[in-house]
Swiss-Prot record:
Cofactor(s) of this protein: pyridoxal 5'-phosphate
Native organism: Streptomyces avermitilis (strain ATCC 31267 / DSM 46492 / JCM 5070 / NBRC 14893 / NCIMB 12804 / NRRL 8165 / MA-4680)
Keywords on record: Aminotransferase, Pyridoxal phosphate, Transferase
Lineage: Bacteria, Bacillati, Actinomycetota, Actinomycetes, Kitasatosporales
Reaction(s) catalysed (UniProt annotation): an aromatic L-alpha-amino acid + 2-oxoglutarate = an aromatic oxo-acid + L-glutamate
Listed HAMAP family: HisC_aminotrans_2, Phe_aminotrans_2
Modified residues (N6-(pyridoxal phosphate)lysine): K223
InterPro entries reported for this sequence: Aminotrans_II_pyridoxalP_BS (IPR001917), Aminotransferase_I/II_large (IPR004839), ArAT (IPR024892), HisP_aminotrans (IPR005861), HistidinolP_aminotransfase (IPR050106), PyrdxlP-dep_Trfase (IPR015424), PyrdxlP-dep_Trfase_major (IPR015421), PyrdxlP-dep_Trfase_small (IPR015422)
Sample GO molecular function, one term: aromatic-amino-acid transaminase activity
GO annotation terms (biological process): L-histidine biosynthetic process
UniProt KW Nucleotide-binding keyword: no
EC identifiers of the protein: 2.6.1.57
Name the record gives this protein: Aromatic amino acid aminotransferase
Length: 359
């Protein structure tokens, strides 16, 4: 038998493996997972009932067009069906966008540090990442991002709020940036955490999309809606882009379970957003407590907080795990910590208080 292996694409060799948030391992009687920005609340009863009604049809393929969900989204956002596309979470839709726009020789711009899937899916597409450092305040440097545009730029990600820092881009600076972007470059406003924003100066990406044909908005049901395990996200974009997204979608990628749960969640939006409000209040408590302890915390508008710890990052993550909470470390930089159950947040704050005294 030949020892020659099948030939694979050379650009795949350098792709880092995506690192999900570490699961909660029992460090004590109770362990809490604050590493993946998940919603700590279980699905609403109505959502569970909707999912249960789909169980008997597992032998059938899902509605490939996501017709029911698309209709609900069209009504909810006031956009034409032709301006919508769905996928397996917003990261799945982001990958479809790259497949539709970018390839070898093209460039994709995004802030760094930002969502860690961006470099992975960019490299998979064959395009080149152009990473623009955040400002010292951990905010997108939009002027530098605009300066980085070349004739090879095909797509720009703006993560708003930014993951993992929670910081935001406000309306005036975003509009100035968009004015500098050529009309043939697609700007993707990744708004996975949109529902947690309380700053009135942060624009709704859908309003921006209505005014600018080269803007696409990404949303997900994973965070505020609590459907992370079902993998459903969507894009709102003008027809040429949305049509390309539908062409690059994995056939039958969004399960019927996910579609039905997403529709039920949209219909129960008021109740779900009440839960989001409770998480925002808890976020404010956590941030205030950290600042009282002497920590410098960026102004977060997401469901997580960011602590810069530099070389002490892994030590801090280990201390949290030993106490019974799992956080998301970025070695040499800092930790991202989800705002979770009140009990979990209290444990985290006890660790930060002890650790602060050791610095």
């Amino acid at each position: 038998m030949s020892e020659t292996s099948p030939k694979l694409r050379a650009e795949l060799e350098g792709i880092p493996t995506y690192k999900p948030g570490k699961p909660a391992a029992a460090a004590g009687p109770v362990a809490y997972k604050l590493s993946s920005n998940e919603n700590p609340y279980p699905p609403l009863p109505g959502v569970l009932e909707s999912v249960a009604s789909s169980v008997g049809s597992f032998n059938r393929y899902p509605d490939m067009a996501c017709s029911g969900l698309m209709s609900e989204l069209s009504e909810r956002f006031g956009v034409p069906l032709s301006h919508l596309a769905t996928g397996t979470g917003s990261v799945g839709v982001a990958q479809q966008l790259l497949q539709a726009t970018s390839g070898p020789g093209d460039e994709v711009i995004y802030a760094w540090r930002s969502f860690e899937a961006y470099p992975i899916i960019t490299q998979v597409s064959g395009a080149t990442s152009v990473q623009v450092p955040l400002t010292p305040g951990d905010v997108h440097d939009l002027d530098a991002m605009a300066d980085a545009i070349t004739d090879r730029t095909r797509l720009i990600f703006v993560c708003n709020p930014n993951n993992p820092t929670g910081t935001v881009v406000r309306r005036a600076e975003l509009e100035r940036f968009l004015d500098r972007v050529p009309s043939d470059v697609l700007v993707v406003l990744d708004e996975a955490y949109r529902e947690f924003i309380r700053d009135p100066e942060v624009p709704d990406g859908v309003a921006i999309y209505r005014e600018r044909p080269n803007v696409c908005v990404l949303r997900t049901f994973s965070k505020a809606y609590g459907l992370a395990g079902l993998r459903v996200g969507f894009a709102i974009a003008h027809e040429p882009v949305a049509a390309a997204l539908r062409k690059t979608a994995v056939p039958f990628g969004v399960s019927q379970l996910a579609q039905d749960a997403a529709v039920a969640s949209l219909r129960a939006e008021d109740e779900l957003l009440g839960r989001v409000g409770a998480l925002v209040c808890e976020r404010q408590r956590v941030v205030a407590s950290l600042r009282e302890q002497g920590w410098t915390v960026p102004e977060t508008q997401a469901n997580f907080v960011w602590l810069r710890l530099g070389e002490r990052t892994l030590d801090f993550a280990a201390a949290c795990e030993q106490a019974g909470v799992v956080v998301r470390p970025f070695a040499g930089e800092g930790v991202r910590v989800t705002v979770g159950e009140n009990e979990a947040n209290d444990i985290f704050l006890k660790v930060t208080e002890r650790f602060r005294k050791e610095l």
